[in-house]
């Protein structure tokens, strides 16, 4: 398992709260766990299009494990905490809107989870002194960003190391991108471009509080972008919608200014739903940038999750098969979206 498994204590321990009846009404039924030896959950809301259960099913089939990740589409953290007490539960992918709210209920956090302030992975450990099951939080989104660049850029020293980076957006994915660029990818300054200044201010404040916000720069105008050194790595964390409002169009012009600078680099386009082939990605490619599809981040964060849950290494997991199945699934989804 990676060094990310080193844990630090959270402020409170895993709490079990009986779900209120009105919360249970939001969930038509809990998933059937009886066919499986062990089970986990994809816990969040609006999960129908998620490829997470598919990705993990490939791993479990390859390892001959009768395991499954089941969708738990619910607003109720108490319900999830109750289900997580089952002896055959192995862990969970945690998605929106629970990535921050789940943290106070965990026993330990990995350094990445603590520093980003969001948990997308719940895994289990055993207290050696008491034998008690410990519920631990990790953030593998940062691994997804890191490995997207490491696995796909052949000359990182030339492309992005010791150069500024650019993050487009101001949500949770942007925070993970900032962390990965700062900690592992050798970024100097990290430019932030977003339509909402308050979101950028929040990212800078949170990262500063956690010790890595001093090199963050809010780029708020085309003129400012023109005067800055061009980035080597770009992470785009916004939906694939044509800009309509004045603020959205300003963001597009600022990004175009960076893309048109003489020295190019690599852009990770985090958006892959309904298609990984986005308008922004096409623009970057036209300007001579290497574009890395967002499915790479999906795959690598998922692989890291399975390392926590199964204890296996990258070499033991079917990475190429995962890539092929996800690519085929996306091609099918893209075809239906355009037809």
Curated annotation (Swiss-Prot):
GO terms for molecular function: quinate 3-dehydrogenase (NAD+) activity; shikimate 3-dehydrogenase (NADP+) activity. It catalyses: L-quinate + NAD(+) = 3-dehydroquinate + NADH + H(+). It comes from the Eukaryota. Pathway: Aromatic compound metabolism; 3,4-dihydroxybenzoate biosynthesis; 3-dehydroquinate from D-quinate (NAD(+) route): step 1/1. Induction: Expression is induced in the presence of quinic acid. The quinic acid (qa) gene cluster is subject to two levels of gene control: a primary system which responds to the presence of quinic acid via the qa-1S repressor protein that blocks the qa-1F activator, and a secondary system which represses transcription of qa genes in the presence of a preferred carbon source such as glucose. Its EC number is 1.1.1.24. Disulfide bonds: none annotated. One of its GO terms (biological process) is shikimate metabolic process. It is an enzyme of class 1 (oxidoreductase). Keywords: NAD, Oxidoreductase, Quinate metabolism. It holds the Pfam family Shikimate_dh_N. Quinate dehydrogenase; part of the qa gene cluster that mediates the catabolism of quinic acid (QA) and as such, allows the use of QA as a sole carbon source. Catalyzes the first reaction in the inducible quinic acid catabolic pathway by converting quinate into 3-dehydroquinate. The qa cluster encodes 3 inducible enymes (qa-2, qa-3 and qa-4) catalyzing the first three reactions in the catabolism of quinic acid to protocatechuic acid (also known as 3,4-Dihydroxybenzoic acid). This is Quinate dehydrogenase. The lineage of its organism: Eukaryota, Fungi, Dikarya, Ascomycota, Pezizomycotina.
